[in-house]
Design a protein with these regions (language model features):
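Small/polar loops that bind or transfer phosphate-bearing groups
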Residues: 25, 55-56, 112
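Thiol/disulfide oxidoreductase modules built on the thioredoxin-like
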Residues: 67-74, 80-128, 132
Length: 132
């Protein structure tokens, strides 16, 4: 699948192969998504050997930029999926959905709903174990 980053540049998910990847499907209108963003941002900062990819589902660049500024969030690898193709591809029925891939690109875990710090840490351990 191919997406656009916040600057309009095309990005493909296979560009992130080579280390564990956490993909978070989210939207600004989703209260659990909004609540878990600080947890994900903190994990992104504390685990540089894991790539965090945030794929917004169906919203405009401007809307997402305003949300990030208002919430004072700094997310790496922020992608826009204007037609929610990723959600369809992984059969996500609701948001947020978080997918955990090992360094070879194999799905090792997924989480539907809001992630707590503890549940995120547990899922991260599972992709580390699988990558060893």
């Amino acid at each position: 699948l191919s997406f656009r980053d916040i600057h309009g540049q095309p990005v493909q998910l296979q560009d992130y192969l080579g280390q564990p990847v956490v993909i978070n499907l989210w939207a600004t209108w989703c209260p659990p998504c909004r609540r878990e963003m600080p947890v994900l941002q903190a994990a992104q900062e504390k685990t540089p050997d894991v790539t965090f990819v945030f794929i917004n589902q169906g919203e405009s660049t401007l809307h997402v930029q305003h949300f990030l500024a208002a919430q004072e969030l700094s997310l790496d690898n922020l992608l826009l999926d204007s037609n929610a193709h990723m959600g369809q591809a992984v059969s996500s029925l609701s948001l947020p959905t978080t997918l955990f891939y090992d360094a070879e690109g194999r799905l090792r875990n997924n989480h539907l709903g809001e992630l707590s710090k503890a549940s995120l840490n547990h899922a991260l351990q599972s992709i580390y174990k699988e990558s060893l």
